[in-house]
Amino acid sequence: HGGGQNRLGLGSKAEVLGIINPDVVASPNLIANLVSELLEDDVAIAEAAQVPMEHPKDYDRNTLETTFASGCCMFIKQEIFEQINGFDDINFFMYCDDVDLSWRVRLLGKKIHFVPLATVYHDHRIDESSNLVVGHAEFYYSALGGLLLSIKWGNQKRTEQIVNSLKTDPSYSEVYSEYSAMVENGKLPQATVGSDKVAIFTPTGFADYRWTN
């Protein structure tokens, strides 16, 4: 995911880059609403709202500021994308790479805005109990990405909790095997300087939630 975005975005002559999942349908005013938010000098990323299943992370209702942008649909200033060298496609294949990118943007002192009027339909499957259906790739890479994010952003307690969970839960055996191989081969991410200034870890994820299931 991140590697493909980097190949297209790094070195681009565009002023704004659109990071958009292939399983979304844009609303008519999506581009105008996101680009207009980026007219503010200190705003580096503008994030779209997802429907019908909105992302639950919180945002400031007055300023629209939020702590990270979902890679489902966000616009980022190309100069900022260039400055942080895009997505970290060395440590993240997909999932949590958007959080990592967002936090590195915030380390620059830039802001991320959630734009409720900029909407995309994000295709999801739910089961008969209205629970989100998660495929193997999402299950695997989201678990691995969450672990690598906690390592890269210096949350040792969270890292230990995740590793213990992966080790004892048979459903995560593939993820634990990959982690063990990374440890053996010295492939774990290096800790980020200044992580305490921007990184947020909560029981539900990487931001405060407006609601929980």
Language-model segments: residues:
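Short aromatic/hydrophobic "clamp" motif used to bind/position activated sugar donors
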Residues: 17
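A recurrent flexible, glycine/aromatic-enriched loop bordering the glycosyltransferase active site
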Residues: 57-76, 99-100, 130
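Active-site donor/metal-binding and catalytic loop motifs
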Residues: 115-134, 145-148
